[in-house]
A protein has these predicted regions:
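Bacterial Sec-pathway N-terminal export signals of envelope proteins
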Residues: 1-43, 218-248, 297-299, 323-326, ...
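A short glycine-centered flexible hinge/capping loop motif at secondary-structure junctions
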Residues: 159-163, 368-372, 409-413
């Protein structure tokens, strides 16, 4: 489990680990999830507040003056102050069920934060691998350009010396320019990968170009990967855990709706004082004290039962979403495992094909220089070699990317001790 929680360390790339730390600290989607979690905490506190009595204080000052037409003229001030208290007795559990719903919403928010974290870690690693793959492909293309330029110079010399016709020279030139035309698209893809990575880190596109300009090899995963058992996967996946908590919240809301069928009992009380003098508030005073229960019984309300049906339907939908999340989880794990295994086999086949293409290219070049074959064979061998080199480098990236997707499907990137306190900043993935 600890290895799964910090799966990117298995790739043994310190720069990737550094980028992931920066992404956790600066990603805007993660900060949004933290803000939603703070909202859920506040809503839970609001729901819990209904379990306790309320107490309010009030005060007023009034100036009174009689009309002179009455026969005398008088004026004065009246001051009043008081306290009002109320407490809804939760006889049928409506308030408690609303607290349960808010608590489930809060835990769903925690799982949502973890889900965003898991996706962020995977997306950061995937973009980093794509970046290194583009660098590797670009290096292979540039190396092939050097070889093809030498071939072109050779055909040009042989053509000028009358040892060959111009067809070989034009074929070499065509091959050279065709390879050269692939370089701009590779550089464009490399730049786009850097920019996407910068945005994931919460930085301005272009900020990482200097930092990541030096080419490095694509990080490769270990030969053996432990994936655990399906039951463990279901327990780890934040999206499955979130769907379960959303189902619990909606189940509680059904209870809230059903509680509206029954009477509500509230205890109210108030105490007040009215006086004409602030200097001596106990003189010329009027005290008032009141209190007692209030019961509200729904005799005719045609919205209560339809609301129960609405909440029950929403509960059914939440259950279906939970079941779908479980199936999606199992599907993604199975697909990732198959993709990883098949790409390993494909990479091995490509490696053997590239080795054969290297031998063919060397032999064709030797025979051409010796005048034993025409340049068409050299041209075909160089094309095949470049193609297999490019495919092999793409396959290296695909193997690592499939491992990353597998770790994401397994819910890797957090532990049960992961801090999700929104007020304490981003959750640490370790």
């Amino acid at each position: 489990p600890n290895l799964l929680a910090a799966w990117w360390t298995t790739l043994d790339d310190p720069q990737l680990s550094s980028l992931i730390e920066r992404a956790v600290a600066g990603n805007l989607n993660l900060k949004t999830a933290q803000s939603r979690l703070r909202e859920s905490r506040a809503r839970r506190s609001m729901a819990e507040g209904r379990l306790f009595p309320t107490l309010n204080a009030s005060g007023s000052a009034t100036s009174r003056r009689t009309d002179t037409n009455v026969g005398f003229d008088s004026h004065g001030e009246v001051y009043s102050a008081g306290f009002d208290a109320g407490w809804e007795l939760d006889l049928f559990g409506g308030v408690r069920r609303s607290v349960e719903a808010a608590e489930a919403d809060l835990t769903a928010g925690e799982e949502d934060l973890r889900d965003v974290l898991v996706s962020l870690l995977a997306e950061t690693a995937l973009n980093y691998v794509e970046l290194r793959t583009f660098q590797s492909r670009l290096a292979a293309a540039e190396a092939s350009l050097a070889t093809q330029e030498a071939s072109y110079e050779l055909t040009l010399w042989r053509s000028q010396a009358g040892l060959d016709d111009e067809l070989a020279m034009y074929q070499a030139r065509y091959n050279l320019e065709n390879t050269r035309s692939q370089v701009p698209s590779l550089r464009s893809g490399l730049s786009e990968a850097m920019n996407r990575l910068a945005v994931l880190l919460g930085e301005t596109p272009g900020n990482l170009h200097a930092e990541l300009a030096e080419p490095r090899a694509v990080p490769l995963p270990p030969e053996r990967i432990a994936v655990g058992v399906p039951a463990d996967t279901l327990r780890r996946r934040p999206d499955v855990r979130r769907a379960e908590r959303e189902l619990a919240a909606q189940t509680a809301r059904v209870g809230v709706a059903m509680a509206n069928l029954y009477p509500q009992l509230t205890l109210n009380g108030s105490i007040g004082l009215e006086t004409t003098s602030l200097r001596d508030p106990l003189s010329a005073r009027t005290w008032s004290i009141s209190g007692g229960p209030r019961i509200t019984l729904p005799l005719f309300d045609r919205t209560i039962r339809p609301n129960i049906e609405v909440q029950s339907a929403l509960q059914e939908q939440a259950l279906i979403r939970y079941e779908a999340a479980v199936l999606t989880c199992l599907e993604e794990v199975e697909n990732a495992l198959v993709a990883y295994g098949q790409e390993l086999q494909r990479r091995e086949n490509l490696r053997e094909a590239m080795e054969a293409a290297q031998s063919a290219a060397m032999l064709a070049q030797y025979k051409y220089q010796a005048g034993l074959t025409d340049f068409g064979n050299v041209l075909e061998a160089e094309r095949s070699l470049l193609s297999f080199q490019d495919q092999l480098r793409q396959s290296d990236g695909a193997v690592t990317s499939n491992v990353i997707r597998l770790y994401k499907a397994l819910g890797g990137g957090w532990t049960p001790m992961t801090a999700v306190a929104a007020t304490q900043g981003p959750a640490e993935p370790l």
